[in-house]
A protein has these predicted regions:
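Conserved functional acidic sites
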Residues: 1-157
Length: 157
């Protein structure tokens, strides 16, 4: 074992509520994207390399025609203010709190959705703390954790 984090499957359940529902309870509308390594020729992928290197590209998940996600390592030395492209959509205070030139940034995309991608940001000792869609500016960020002293000072969102 080299410390690489493998991704062996996921169960997706998309729920939706509809106008006029009484009671207004979400209903299961699709399970697209679910996969399990070893079933129906699905393969495990890698969530995070033990020793990431800028330029590496690897499969995050693979279920033919269902889940074909790819990760590309963009940087292993991210620090806010150095690369303006990687800063786009990133909350400055969050990046400054967690990244001292040692964060990993990935570009994640699906072979099934050409042109769509997100960037994910990983901090040492914490892991994934931010996901940014540069086109829509949608941001998903860590708001708390209890296993690293840096988490105590996470900026309010």
């Amino acid at each position: 074992m080299d410390g690489t984090t493998w991704y062996c499957g996921e169960q997706v359940k998309d729920l939706e509520s509809f106008d006029g529902d009484n009671p207004k309870l979400p209903e299961l509308v699709k399970i697209d994207g679910s996969f399990k390594a070893g079933r129906d020729r699905d393969k495990p992928g890698i969530i995070f390399q033990a020793d990431p290197k800028a330029g590496q590209v690897y499969l995050e998940e693979f279920s033919l025609g269902n889940a074909e996600d790819v990760t590309e390592i963009l940087s292993t030395t991210y620090k806010f203010g150095v690369n303006h492209e990687l800063d786009r959509g990133v909350p400055k205070s969050l990046a400054q709190q967690l990244c001292a030139g040692d964060c990993v940034v990935t570009r994640n995309y699906s072979l099934l959705e050409p042109g769509a991608f997100a960037r994910k940001y990983y901090a040492p000792g914490i892991g994934a703390f931010l996901e940014v869609n540069p086109k829509t500016r949608d941001v998903v960020q860590l708001v708390g954790c209890n296993f690293d002293p840096k988490c105590a000072a996470l900026p309010a969102h």
